[in-house]
């Protein structure tokens, strides 16, 4: 066995000292480590400053393009072009006129289809003879629906008051067949443009109580800068129904979000809004037209906790004392109350409009495009934060018959809640939808 001639220690000696890792000299740390730490801290500080600047700019300023410059955010949607290309007025709440009458409608008599003869102004019931899926799709498109419809034959009833005619299509609209004879099938067309108004759970008829999203899967929270402002109702994958007065203070679309799928505020993801559309203001009736449609940037995926509610039928006239439901996260007391974190529900009833307009109530302020609901003795009502939410009626499905609009106080016996009557605005809703197809 060879041995290093310069070594004093034999190779087979057990007296071997372990090797030690060399220590990093303090001078090296001072020269390399400290500058690296300083650089990292400086970079972190710069990032924090940049983020803070961006947050401040996004909150208080809007960036115009060509040329790039900032304008105060309060100048957004003020009706004046402050950016050279007008970007500051693009993403704003827009008004939409009522428009022409939509020439198809659905009746509360089993959702039967009626068609307008534009030449005479008369309405006719659609006979089931030769009615096809293509005609059903045309009818629903005329009302602005994009989903696949369903239809069936229902027997002509003894109270049928409209003439029954065969239907054809011309220029993507339904028309009466010129040579239409008697309705040989003896059946009308029952049409459903969207599966709606079905929930997983039926509410109990009691006073005010905590609600479950399983009972009201169409209820949404409409929020500005992450703060709940109003309620709303899902009508289809793209559209949410609410009140126009929710957007009086903030008419820019950017910071509005919709939250769906939960009965707890803030516990569900937000959805971006593409458009907010209101009806044109009528100075003669300033409290009329309190209705708005929000178009979502991306369509909703329906589930057990996210579903649409049905629109009312055009002839849905509810008599006094008809039971209805209200829901919302609004204030639990008129004075000194606070917003509820949990969705609340309550049973109310239709209040006669004559009683609602009495001298000790609203003194004629409630118009034909509004309706009143509450309980005669008072104490159950919508309040601040419930605005825009649905007033609901259940037949075979749930229908949104009203939108929480206004009132004097919350829960007074002579001043019940006043609601936008949705059936009065069906034509406007259909025209908006058609324009956005």
Swiss-Prot record:
Domain SRCR: 94-204
Subcellular location: Cell membrane
Top-level taxon in the UniProt lineage: Eukaryota
Transmembrane segments: 33-53
Cited CDD domains: LDLa (cd00112), Tryp_SPc (cd00190)
Cleavage, annotated site positions: 204-205
Cysteine disulfide partners in this protein: 64-83, 77-92, 127-183, 140-193, 196-310, 230-246, 356-372, 383-410
Cytoplasmic side: 1-32
Active site per the UniProt annotation: 245, 290, 387
Domain called LDL-receptor class A: residue spans: 61-93
Domain Peptidase S1: 205-434
Gene Ontology CC terms, in alphabetical order: extracellular space; membrane; plasma membrane; secretory granule
Gene Ontology biological process terms from the UniProt entry: negative regulation of growth rate; positive regulation of viral entry into host cell; protein processing; proteolysis; regulation of gene expression; response to wounding
GO molecular function: serine-type endopeptidase activity; serine-type peptidase activity
Effect of mutating residue 387 to A: Abolishes protease activity
EC assignment: 3.4.21.-
Residues exposed to the Extracellular side: 54-437
Chief site of localization: membrane
Top-level class of the enzyme under EC nomenclature: hydrolase
Expression by tissue: High levels in pancreatic, gastric, colorectal and ampullary cancer. Very weak expression in normal gastrointestinal and urogenital tract. Coexpressed with ACE2 within mature enterocytes.
Record's function text: Plasma membrane-anchored serine protease that directly induces processing of pro-uPA/PLAU into the active form through proteolytic activity. Seems to be capable of activating ENaC.
Protein name: Transmembrane protease serine 4
Provenance organism: Homo sapiens
Source taxonomy: Eukaryota, Metazoa, Chordata, Craniata, Vertebrata
């Amino acid at each position: 066995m060879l041995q290093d001639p310069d070594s004093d220690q034999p190779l087979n000696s057990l007296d071997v000292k372990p090797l030690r890792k060399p220590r990093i000299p303090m001078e090296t740390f001072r020269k390399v480590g400290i500058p690296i730490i300083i650089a990292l801290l400086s970079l972190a500080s710069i990032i924090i400053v940049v983020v803070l600047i961006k947050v401040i700019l996004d909150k208080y300023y809007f960036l115009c393009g060509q040329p790039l410059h900032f304008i105060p955010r309060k100048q957004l949607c003020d009706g004046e072009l402050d950016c050279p290309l007008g970007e500051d007025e693009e993403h704003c709440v827009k008004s939409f006129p009522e428009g022409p009458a939509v020439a198809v409608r659905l009746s509360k008599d089993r959702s039967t289809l009626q068609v307008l003869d534009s030449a005479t102004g008369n309405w006719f019931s659609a006979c089931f003879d030769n009615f096809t899926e293509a005609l059903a799709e045309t009818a629903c498109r005329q009302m602005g629906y994009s989903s696949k419809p369903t239809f069936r034959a229902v027997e002509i009833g003894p109270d049928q008051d409209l003439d029954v005619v065969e239907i054809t299509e011309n220029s993507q609209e339904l028309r009466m067949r010129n040579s239409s004879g008697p309705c040989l099938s003896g059946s009308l067309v029952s049409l459903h443009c969207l599966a709606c108004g079905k929930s997983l759970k039926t509410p109990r008829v009691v006073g005010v109580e905590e609600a479950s999203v399983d009972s009201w899967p169409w209820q949404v929270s409409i929020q500005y800068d992450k703060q709940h402002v109003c309620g709303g109702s899902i009508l289809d994958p793209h559209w949410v129904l609410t009140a126009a007065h929710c957007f009086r203070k903030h008419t820019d679309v950017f910071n509005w979000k919709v939250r769906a799928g939960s009965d707890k505020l803030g516990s569900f993801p937000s959805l971006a809004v593409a458009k907010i559309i209101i009806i044109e203001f009528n100075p003669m009736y300033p409290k009329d037209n309190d209705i708005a449609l929000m178009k979502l940037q991306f369509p909703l995926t329906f589930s057990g906790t996210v579903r649409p509610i049905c629109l009312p039928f055009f002839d849905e006239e509810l008599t006094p004392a008809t039971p209805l439901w209200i829901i919302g996260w609004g204030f639990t007391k008129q004075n000194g109350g606070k917003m509820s974190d949990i969705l609340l529900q309550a049973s109310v009833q239709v209040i006669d409009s004559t009683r609602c307009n009495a001298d000790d109530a609203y003194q004629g302020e409630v118009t034909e495009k509004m309706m009143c609901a509450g309980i005669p003795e008072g104490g159950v009502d919508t309040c601040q934060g419930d605005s825009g939410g649905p007033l609901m009626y259940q037949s075979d499905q749930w229908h949104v018959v009203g939108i929480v609009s206004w009132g004097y106080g919350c829960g007074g016996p002579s001043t019940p809640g006043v609601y936008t009557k949705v059936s009065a605005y069906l034509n406007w809703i259909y025209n908006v939808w058609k324009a956005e197809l």
